[in-house]
């Protein structure tokens, strides 16, 4: 997967994209003046299957849209994030997905990681939330089984 941003991303958005690229072991490019066609061509050039574009509102990551390398929109989620400035210690090759939210099970196909019912280390946990603002929380656990600072709160699935 290739991860990119909207144009002129804030420092927090760039840090979030770098965190995601470290977690999934994928490429991250600053969008700059590239349009969507250029981003899709860049993904093909790097042999990436999917593209994730992170958009921001007032300097904070607010939406992640996933595209296939043919330009088809696969999924869009509205998010709030907390980024990590410390080392994540996640091994992308051994990453697993544990999902308690059926609508987000598709992320295992998008990220090309195995969907498991449970895990103890090196996994992503998608849990359901019952508060008024968020419907799910995506938490990241490192190779030691410890929770990372990186969190994604899903407000809405489009």
Where do the language-model regions lie?
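Phospho-regulatory, Ser/Thr- and acidic-rich intrinsically disordered linkers and terminal tails
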Residues: 1-158
